[in-house]
Every structure is written in C-alpha cells, then in structure tokens.
Amino acid sequence: MRAFINKLFLIALSGLMLLINSPALADSNSKSPEIIKTSTNIIKQHQKISRESAVKVIGLEGGHGSGAYVKLNGQYFVITAKHVVGRDWLFLIEGSNKEESVVGQVIYRSPTKDIALLRVPRLKNRKPAKLQETEQKDMAIGEELVYSGYPSSYELLTSSGIVSGYENWGESVLVQGWAWPGSSGSAVFDENGNVVGLVIAIGLEKFRGSAQLIETLVYVVTIDKEEMKAIKKISK
C-alpha cells in the first residue's frame, strides 16, 4: 500500500512540473489578475512575514517553485522542497515583483524529507523568516496556517488553510487550503510568524481512469528535530 501511495505522488509531482513548463501556464506574455504587491493591506503579522520572505526558485533550464528567505548563523539561505531543486545545484532566486535576482547554490538535500536548503547572498528587498522546529504531532487539528508562493504564471499569492489531518506518506500534515503547480516549496507559517513546514504536494485522485488534482488538499512537511539539527549544522 505504501509503495502504491509513493508511486501515486511521484506521478503527481511529475505532473506538477509538466504543468509548470506548459506554455499555457508559464507564457511570459500571459496576463495575471491584479495582485496585491505590498503588505500595507495585510492585517495579520504572520501573513506579512510570509509575503516579505517569499522567493521564487527558478531552474536554469526552466520550471520554478517557491521558497522562503531565512537567516541562520549570520548567513542567508533559501529553504524549499527537495523536488523543486531535483539534482541541480544552481538556481535563480527572485524576490517579489522581480525587484532582485541572485544565484542560489544547493547545500543540503534531506535524505528522508522533501526539504532542501540553498545558500544565497543577502537580499535587500526580502526579510528573513525564522525556522521553528516542529513535529507532525505538534500541528493541531484546526490550527490556522499561512503560506505565500508563486503558483503557475502568477506573481506572489498568499493562501491560508487549516490543519485537517495527517498522512504517513512523508510524515505529512494535510491542510485544507489551496495550492497549484509552482506552490511547491512555499514556507508554511504558524500564527506566531515562524516557518514550521513546506508545501510539497497537492492531492491526487483517480476518477474514471484518469488522475485529477485536488488543489484544496495541500500536503505539508514539517521541519522536525532531525531536520533542524542537520540544517543548523550545514549552515555553519
């Protein structure tokens, strides 16, 4: 059963990358709806932090995901999903509205979770977020979470959701929210404004022989004790 679930989600993630690269979604000439580009209208502090730290992680050969700008041991990094970086080492990191672009180098890929870390120069137009060690069991049913990222061809979008359940696959937390291709790697914030996890996938169901994405069922991986220990060690 576990093998079947893993296979199912590998298919889901592959599908997400294909959608990211599809002309209909990634056409640079396509027009996006008007997006709030400042945090002046944001009421909650954790929503503001989510937006101010969010970055786009762009592959040198195309495709993109999302991530968050963080500071560890006096140095600067971007945390994202491991499947966003794949086996590549260098990525273009963009801030909101393409105000700033730098090159990020992958320095850590988790051996057990969908988490990766890139070293980056200091970004002038981004504010670093704080990582919070969080176990799956620490995420309470009904807890409100917020995350910001770059789905499809859109600029920065902020979403919120609530913890609705747990999944053994990848020790994930299931969030009733919203995500789409390109959202992978978005940092998930608790109400205290701390990064407690990352968006790694959305639901996938088979219906009449075809696979259908469930954009409102978001899979989140937490930054647990072992991950935090490894991240702190590699960031020294």
Report each predicted region and the residues it spans:
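Bacterial N-terminal signal peptides that target proteins for export
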Residues: 1-12
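Bacterial N-terminal signal peptides
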Residues: 11-20
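Catalytic-histidine neighborhood of serine endopeptidases
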Residues: 23-30, 72-125, 141, 201-203
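A conserved glycine-rich beta-strand in the N-terminal activation segment of trypsin-fold
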Residues: 41-43, 52-78, 101-103, 185
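Catalytic nucleophile loop of clan PA
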Residues: 68, 178-199
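Short, solvent-exposed secondary-structure boundary/capping segments
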Residues: 114-119, 171-177
